[in-house]
């Protein structure tokens, strides 16, 4: 999630949070993201739809090797560092505890431990009434 955008969204709705990890795991934020994924899923073929997702408990950072300087994912690094989370997405669990190393802005190193919720995205087939509603809403004709 984008901390500035989602943080502002949460503040406008009086949703309290203390950290990025806290904000990313709030039920309201997970529902916001779930709704957006479901809306986009309505346009995708069934085999390409997102079925489950998890919000990272921290922003991905080039200084930690997760992104290139041009902000592209370093997929191999991500797969290794977040293997527990990726495995949990495919295993069908509802939550996974992860611990990842972090580098603070002042150069100090530490770890972030968080329980990360895994959220199911409702499967609305494009031809179903719900899928048609989602498609119409996205096109502004609902």
Specify the residue positions occupied by each region the protein language model found.
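AMP-binding adenylation
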Residues: 1-142
């Amino acid at each position: 999630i984008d901390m500035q955008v989602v943080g502002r969204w949460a503040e406008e709705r009086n949703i309290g949070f203390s950290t990025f990890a806290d904000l990313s795991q709030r039920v309201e934020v997970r529902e916001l993201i779930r709704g957006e994924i479901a809306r986009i899923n309505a346009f995708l073929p069934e085999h390409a739809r997102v079925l489950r997702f998890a919000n990272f408990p921290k922003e991905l950072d080039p200084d930690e090797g997760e992104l290139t300087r041009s902000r592209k994912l370093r997929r191999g690094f991500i797969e290794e560092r977040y293997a527990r989370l990726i495995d949990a997405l495919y295993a069908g669990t509802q939550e996974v505890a992860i611990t990842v190393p972090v580098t603070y802005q002042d150069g100090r190193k530490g770890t972030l431990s968080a329980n990360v919720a895994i959220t199911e995205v409702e499967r609305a087939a494009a031809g179903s009434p719900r899928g048609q509603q989602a498609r119409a809403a996205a096109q502004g004709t609902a």
